[in-house]
Amino acid sequence: MTQITEKELKKKYLDLLSQNFDTPEKLATEIINLESILELPKGTEHFVSDLHGEYEAFQHVLRNGSGNVRAKINDIFKERLSTKELNDLTALVYYPEDKLKLIKSDFQNCGQLNVWYITTIEHLIELIKYCSSKYTRSKLRKALPKQYVYIIEELLYKSNEYQNKKSYYETLVNQVIELKQADDLIIGLAYSVQRLVVDHLHVVGDIYDRGPQPDKIMDTLINYHSLDIQWGNHDVLWVGAYAGSKVCLANLLRICARYDNLDIIEDAYGINLRPLLTLAEKYYDADNPAFKPKKRPDKHERLTQREESQITKIHQAIAMIQFKLEIPIIKRRPNFEMEERLVLEKVNYDTNEITVYGNTYPLKDTCFQTVNRDNPAELLPEEEEVMNKLLLSFQQSEKLRRHMSFLMRKGSLYLPYNGNLLIHGCIPVDENGEMESFEIDGHTYSGQELLDVFEYHVRKSFDEKENTDDLSTDLVWYLWTGKYSSLFGKRAMTTFERYFIADKASHKEEKNPYYHLREDVNMVRKMLSDFGLNPDEGRIINGHTPVKEINGEDPIKADGKMLVIDGGFSKAYQSTTGIAGYTLLYNSFGMQLVAHQQFNAKEKILSEGIDELSIKRVVDKELQRKKIRDTNIGKDLQAQIDILKMLMHDRYLD
C-alpha cells in the first residue's frame, strides 16, 4: 500500500472541498458569512441539574427559560400592557394550547376573538423579533414552525416606511384567521419564543433517580434543538444496566421499588416484572417495615394493601440479589478496595449481627431467606433465571435503547465549554487537594486522565453489551459506588446499613474532600488549570449535592469560581433545601443564578399567570460583551474559515 504524503492528503482534501465551492464568489460568500457570524453576541446557555425524573417541574423550567421569557416580555411590553395582560401573554408563551382554550372560552362572539387574534399575533411577532435580534435570519428560520415560515417572515420583516403593502399585511393576518389557522400559528410562535430565548442547554447530570417520569424527560431532550449532558451517578447506573451489568440492574430496580416507581420499568419501558414478583412472593414476607415503599409526593391515591405487599416483597428480593452480585466483583477487582462491602460475608447468621469497619451491630428487619451462609454470593437458580430474563428485556426494549443511545451520544463525564468546566459529581482529591490516584488494568490514573479512562470504559461496556463481567462493565458499577469515582464522591455506599442497622452512625457516608475544598478559590483555580482552562475566566459548574439554602448554604462558592446548581428538582429534597432547585443562565452579558420556588401546578400559571420564579442573582457581569468568536462554536467556525481561506489562496489567488 502506497503511503500518502501530507501534501497529497491536503490536495485531496482541498479538491473535495472545491466541489462545494467551485467559484471564487461562492467561496467568498461563505467566508464573509462565517466571519460575520463571529461578531454576533454569544447565545444564551441554560444550565440545569439533578432533574431526578421530575418531568413537570423540568418542563416548566424549559418553557420559561428560567425566567428569560418573562424578562423579554417585560422588556418590550411592561409600559404598554397591564399586569393581567402581561401575565396572560406570559402564560400563553409557556403553555399555548392550554391558555388558548381558556382565553377563547371568555369571548362572547367571533368579532371580539378576531380582534384578540390580531393583537396577539402582533405581540408575538414583536417578541420573536426581539428574541432573535442576535441571530442570523438563517438561524431564526430554523426556529420557526415550518408550515408558517413564509407568513411569519413576511410579518417579521415588514416595513412601515411606505404604505404600498399595508393592505397586503392586513390580508395576511385576516386570511390566517378566516382559514382557522390562527390557533396553530399562535402555538407555533409561542414555541419559537421558547426556543429563541435559550441557544443551548446543559444538563449537568441525573436525569434518572426516584422521580416518576425520566422517560418523558428523555423524550423532551431528544427533541430539543441544542444540548449536551454530563452523566450523573443515576444516569450511569441505567447505562450500566442496559450495557449488561446485572448489579447495576438490581440497584436501579431496588431504587424504583423503594420509591414506588416500578411503573417506570413496566409502563414506560415495557419490561415484564412478573418473574421477579413470582420469586418475591415465594420467599419474602409483606410486613418487613424496612422495605415498605416510600410515599410518593406526586401520588394522591394511596397504594392498595395488595400493591404495597407486592412492592415490599419485590424490594427485598432485588436487594438480596444486589448484595449477592456485588461479592464476585469486589473479589475479582481488589484494586476497587471494597472488601468492607462484602456485607453478606460479614454477617454472623447465628447471632444476627454484622461487623463492619471494626464495629459490631445487631441487625433488624433481616430477610436472608435465600442466602447460603456458606457461600453468600450464590444465587438461587430462580434468582439467576430472573436476572437473565430482566437483562434480556432491558436490552430488547426499543424505547430504552433509544434513550440510552442518546445519553451516550450527547453525554460525557465532564465537559469544558466556553471556558467553564461542567461536571456532575466531583474531581476525586485527598485532604491536601492533590488528585487521588486509582489503578485500572495495571496503570495508575488521576484527575482529568482518570475521568477520561472511566469514560472510555463506559463507552466500551456500552458497545460490548454481551460481556457482563468484564473490566469495563465492572467499572460502570464502580462509578456508581466506588470511593475514587467522580460521580459517587463518597468513601462508601452504606445501603446495607440503612436497611438493617438501627444505629444511624453506621449510615454515614463520608464525602470526598473535594466537597469542602471547593469553597477554596485557589483549589478551584488549580482544578481549572489541571483541565486546561483559564483560571482567571473559567468556573466549575457542579451538580449532585443539594444546596441547603434553608441552612444558609450558598450555591456561589470560592469567590464565584464554583457554582453548585443542584437545589433539588426532586420533591424529596425540597424540605431539606428550602427551594425547588437552581438553574443558571449565561448570556453575552454574564451569568445569573436562578433559585426556583416549588412548582405546584401549571393550572395556577394558566389561571393567574403568576410564575413560581425565581430569584435571580447576578454571578458576574462581563466587562466586554462576549461574542461568538469567544466560544467553542467560534473556535470551530474560525477553523472552517482558515480552511476556506487556504482553499481561496490555493485555487483562486495564487
UniProtKB/Swiss-Prot annotation:
Residues 298-307 have a biased composition (Basic and acidic residues). Its cofactor is Mn(2+). One of its GO terms (biological process) is gluconeogenesis. Pathway: Carbohydrate biosynthesis; gluconeogenesis. Residues 288-307 are annotated as: Disordered. It catalyses: beta-D-fructose 1,6-bisphosphate + H2O = beta-D-fructose 6-phosphate + phosphate. Its EC number is 3.1.3.11. GO terms for molecular function: fructose 1,6-bisphosphate 1-phosphatase activity. The keyword Manganese applies. It is an enzyme of class 3 (hydrolase). It comes from the Bacteria. Keywords: Carbohydrate metabolism, Hydrolase, Manganese. Belongs to the FBPase class 3 family. This is Fructose-1,6-bisphosphatase class 3. It comes from Staphylococcus aureus (strain NCTC 8325 / PS 47). The lineage of its organism: Bacteria, Bacillati, Bacillota, Bacilli, Bacillales. The gene is fbp.
